[in-house]
């Protein structure tokens, strides 16, 4: 089995396991950070390839078609972890669009591939995604809503890259009288 075929298979299993647990709904935002260098067993930022990026991008697009989620592709630290998204998504949520073109050496291979293969791509600086996937320890946490909830899948690596996934939940707020699950005794004023 070639490395690319293995990466595709691992990604398919990981996304399927994730969806089974997280139940993402149409319209929710899914952020992806990825080091294609780490996927190939190299140090982050040193050996990214468009071939690996294409394989990962195409699997993520299939996941999007199956679930109706919106994708956001995180750039590398050289672009302050900005995100490549469809312009329609940026306009819908009034995300501020910034002017930059991701390239493999400043943006990363996956974000660059996404920028050149989405319908109408733009780059934004900030997002609060409903869920996400981090391939190669790229640190997507800054782009997740509070509170991040880790989701464990049967896949621990994509290629040679460590993979983590998370969904989010609303904060539990309040003090001593706060109630988090409605019960008969908490609804009435007796």
Curated annotation (Swiss-Prot):
<dbReference type="InterPro" id="IPR028345">
    <property type="entry name" value="Antibiotic_NAT-like"/>
</dbReference>
<dbReference type="InterPro" id="IPR006340">
    <property type="entry name" value="DUF436"/>
</dbReference>
<dbReference type="Pfam" id="PF04260">
    <property type="entry name" value="DUF436"/>
</dbReference>
<protein>
    <recommendedName>
        <fullName>UPF0340 protein BCE_5442</fullName>
    </recommendedName>
</protein>
<comment type="similarity">
    <text>Belongs to the UPF0340 family.</text>
</comment>
């Amino acid at each position: 089995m070639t490395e690319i075929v293995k990466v595709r298979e691992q990604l398919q299993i990981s996304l399927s396991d994730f969806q089974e647990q997280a139940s993402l709904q149409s319209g929710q935002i899914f952020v992806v950070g990825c080091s294609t260098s780490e996927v190939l067993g190299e140090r982050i930022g040193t050996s990214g390839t468009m071939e690996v990026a294409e394989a990962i991008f195409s699997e993520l697009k299939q996941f999007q078609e199956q679930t109706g989620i919106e994708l956001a592709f995180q750039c590398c630290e050289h672009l302050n972890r900005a995100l490549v998204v469809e312009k329609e998504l940026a306009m819908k949520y009034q995300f501020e669009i910034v002017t930059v073109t991701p390239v493999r050496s400043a943006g990363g291979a996956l974000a660059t591939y996404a920028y050149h293969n989405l319908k109408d791509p733009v780059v934004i600086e900030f997002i609060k995604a409903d869920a996400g996937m981090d391939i190669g320890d790229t640190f997507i946490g800054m782009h997740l809503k509070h509170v991040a909830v880790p989701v464990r899948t049967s896949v621990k690596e994509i290629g040679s890259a460590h993979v983590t996934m998370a969904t989010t939940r609303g904060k539990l707020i309040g003090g001593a009288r706060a109630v988090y699950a409605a019960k008969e005794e908490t609804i009435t004023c007796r």
